[in-house]
Amino acid sequence: TRDPFLEQQMSKAWQTALRRTIAAVAMGMAAWGTQAQSTDPLVIGEVIARDRCAVCHGPCGQGVAPNFPRLAGQTAQYLTRQLQAFASGERKDTAMTEKVKGLSPSDIEAVAEYYARQKPGHTPSGDEPLLAVGRYVYERGNRHSGLPPCATCHGKQAAGSTELPRLAGQHPQYLIRQIQ
C-alpha cells in the first residue's frame, strides 16, 4: 500500500534537493560567466590559454612535451607577432593556425601578455661536455660553419627580445628541431 504522508515528504525532499542543485548550477554558471565576460586582458588571456593552448604548452606556458615550445617568459610583443603570423598564414603550422582561428587582435595580445607574465621554465642540466660545446657556440659562434654567436641576437642570458625568442629554459629537443 502507498503511504500518502510518506510520498508527500519524499516529494518535498526531492523538490528541495532539486532547488539546491539548480541554485548551485546557476551560481557556478554565473561565476564562469563573470570570468568569461571579463574585460581584464589577463583574465581573458588566461581563459584563452587554458581553453586553446594548455594541451600543448601547459596552463602556465611551461610546455607539456619537448616538441612544444615553452611560452612562459617570452615577451608579449614576440608572442603577439608569432600568433599574428599563424593567423595570417605567414607562419605555417596546421595545429597553430586552427588554434588562433577566430581570435581577435585583442585576444591575441591578451594571451601573449598572459604568457609573458608567467615564470620561465628551467631545463635540468644534461651532458656537461655537450653543454660546454653548446655554451661555446652560443657565446662565440662557429667560425668553421660561419655561424655567428647566438648571444649576438638572443642576448647574453638567452632571454630574447621583442624581436627574437627567449632560448633560456627551452626544451633542447625543440631548439634542435628549430635550428635544423
Region spans (language model):
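Short, Lys/Arg-enriched N-terminal segments with co-localized hydrophobic residues
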Residues: T1-Q9
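Axial heme c-ligation environment in periplasmic c-type cytochrome domains
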Residues: V64-R70, A85-D127, S161-R166
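The canonical Cys-X-X-Cys-His
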Residues: R52-C60, V111, L147-Q157
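Electrostatic cytochrome c docking/interface patches
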Residues: G33-A49, Q62-N67, A116-H144, P165
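An amphipathic alpha-helix signature
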Residues: A76, T80-Q84, P105-A112, P172, ...
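Bacterial N-terminal signal peptides
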Residues: R20-A30
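The feature marks the first
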Residues: P41-G89
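Bacterial N-terminal signal peptides that target proteins for export
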Residues: S11-I22
